[in-house]
Amino acid sequence: MYDETDSQTLVKEIISQDMNLDPKRYDPKKIKRLISNAKNQCLTSNDLLEKADNNFDKTVAEAYKRYRISLSKNNSLDFDDLLLLPVFLLRQNDIVRDYWHKRFKHILVDEYQDTNRTQYELIKLITAGNTEPTKFLNWQDRSIFVVGDADQSIYSFRAADFRILIGFQEDFKTSINDDTKSSLIKLEENYRSSSNILDAANSLIENNSERIDKVLKATKEKGELLTLLSCDDEISEAEAITNKIKSLNNYNQNPIWKNFAILYRTRAQSRVLEESLVRWRIPYTIFGGLRFYDRREIKDAIAY
């Protein structure tokens, strides 16, 4: 079983040695990512080659082909193959497909908005067996139930496609009752956020044309008003946040720092925030990760 490091090393060897290409021009990390995305979209190297309209895309298709051959020679798979190969098997072998179709009669999928095309194909093949889902009629002793929110799709960089959720009812329309309300259940009560936060979120997301319409309603009171802060750069942003924390604490002799939390989108954003907190001598804890200067790659860079 090839992990991410093994796969990356193999792609690098294919680019620099087998194909005799400059890895600075043809970045192995980028090409490995494109191969992974192709697998998550249920695409073969031939599929990529047919779609290629420039030399770089053709190079990716060729690297994908050689990568697959190398894995096969080593009697190995990567993580993406654990989904892709079962899909190919179920597509090609009616007996196997029929067996697993009969084995699983009730399918439940959580976080359906983050499903990729390969996962979607696997679900379809197991659910409908040898019949196209749109033509499958035998739902008396079978069911498929999915849970998701198209407004919360965050894994598009891994080839997840929220449109799969939006198209669910059309894909499995023969399973839907005449009373469509019984087949689509909207969970619109929100127990986490105040109504001011939800009102702002609703006003933004309603501009998205590709979604299942819903309006979140808070069970909590309105809460504090939202504040929009505009800053020139990340340094001034970090300073503004730190100053706000200090002012809210009223510069107490014994401030209670645990009442504050800073949320940020990516790990790289933590550095300037941490530096500002350190400068103001504000203690902090990073949840779900290490402090910026405690990360191995940062330690290595500083030591160098």
Cite the ranges covered by each PLM segment.
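Residue-level signature of catalytic and energy-coupling elements of molecular machines
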Residues: 11, 35, 78, 110, ...
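Conserved interdomain hinge at the start of the Helicase C-terminal
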Residues: 236-252
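Alpha-helical elements of the RecA-like P-loop NTPase motor core of helicases
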Residues: 9, 98, 155, 166, ...
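Core RecA-like ATPase module of SF1/SF2 helicases and allied nucleic-acid translocases
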Residues: 254-304
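Conserved RecA-like helicase ATPase core segment
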Residues: 117-231, 243
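Walker B catalytic acidic pair
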Residues: 103, 111-114, 149
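A basic/glycine-biased coupling hinge at the interface between accessory DNA-binding modules
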Residues: 1-106, 133-142, 160-162, 182, ...
